[in-house]
């Protein structure tokens, strides 16, 4: 299966957005926001960057905790949902490529979580990390969370799996390309009798590769979640040098 590496430009619309909006319960988001606040270690009122932010669930949760959020995403549909949910919270929404962050040394902290890292090619992923570093003040923290760590990914990978979210069903078919170190994924959405197929691709890195990539972008690594056999998501906490 060959996947266009610009797949993300039009993936997050329609049925994919419907599923992502319903995928996680509110209490999961609250726990995740508490963990992020702890890892970022910044006071209330601090400027925090969420990239890519999707529909803004974590930006909104952190804004309610007193932080000033900027959420960046490429999907107009995701951002439309984010804006409609903003209310009186202090969040600025920006439609941008995740490599385009034109705010030198503006933010006190930043995060990229979920499965949002690794969409791009090698240079694109490196450019994203450099852009985040440029947008952070010296000494600011960056939290990168990803399931795309080879030591963990390959032990948990299923060829096919079904997911049910409300009345939506999703079949995920995985193909790991060991030459490219990419996980190519075919998503089959089934909703109201309609079937829609989309494809995505993620670059997978070893622990060492990703640590070196983060450090080359202008960070020092503060903490990495230690490897265990059953670990599915890895969190890296880094400081802007």
Segments from the language model and where they lie:
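Conserved class I S-adenosyl-L-methionine
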Residues: 1-43, 45-52
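A short acidic, Gly/Pro-enriched loop at the edge of an enzyme's catalytic core
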Residues: 102-109
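C-terminal lobe and adjacent flexible extensions of AdoMet/dcAdoMet transferase-like proteins
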Residues: 209-241
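Residues lining the SAM
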Residues: 113-115
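SAM-dependent methyltransferase
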Residues: 123, 143-213
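Class I SAM-dependent methyltransferase SAM/SAH-binding core
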Residues: 57-100
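A short glycine-rich, Lys/Arg-flanked "PGG" loop and its adjoining helix->strand segment in the class I
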Residues: 126-138
């Amino acid at each position: 299966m060959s996947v266009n590496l610009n797949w993300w430009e039009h993936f997050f619309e329609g049925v994919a957005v419907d599923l992502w909006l319903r995928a996680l319960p509110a209490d999961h988001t609250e726990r995740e926001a508490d963990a992020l606040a702890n890892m970022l270690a910044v006071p209330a009122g601090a400027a925090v960057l969420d990239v890519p932010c999707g529909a803004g669930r974590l930006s909104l949760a952190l804004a309610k905790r007193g932080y000033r959020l900027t959420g960046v995403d490429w999907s107009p549909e995701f951002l439309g949902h984010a804006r409609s949910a903003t209310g009186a919270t202090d969040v600025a929404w920006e439609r941008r490529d995740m490599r385009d962050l034109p705010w030198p040394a503006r933010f006190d902290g930043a995060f990229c979580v979920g499965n949002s890292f690794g969409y791009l090619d090698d240079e694109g992923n490196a450019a994203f990390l450099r852009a985040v570093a440029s947008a952070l003040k010296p000494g600011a923290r960056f939290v990168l969370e990803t399931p795309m760590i080879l030591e963990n990914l390959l032990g948990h990978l299923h060829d096919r799996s079904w997911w049910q979210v409300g009345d939506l069903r999703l079949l995920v078919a995985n193909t790991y390309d060991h030459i490219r170190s990419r996980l190519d994924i075919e998503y089959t959405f089934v909703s109201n009798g309609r079937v829609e197929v989309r494809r995505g691709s993620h670059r997978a890195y070893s622990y060492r590769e990703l640590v070196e990539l983060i450090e080359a972008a202008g960070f020092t690594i503060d903490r990495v979640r230690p490897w265990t056999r059953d670990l599915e998501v890895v969190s890296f906490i880094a400081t802007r040098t």
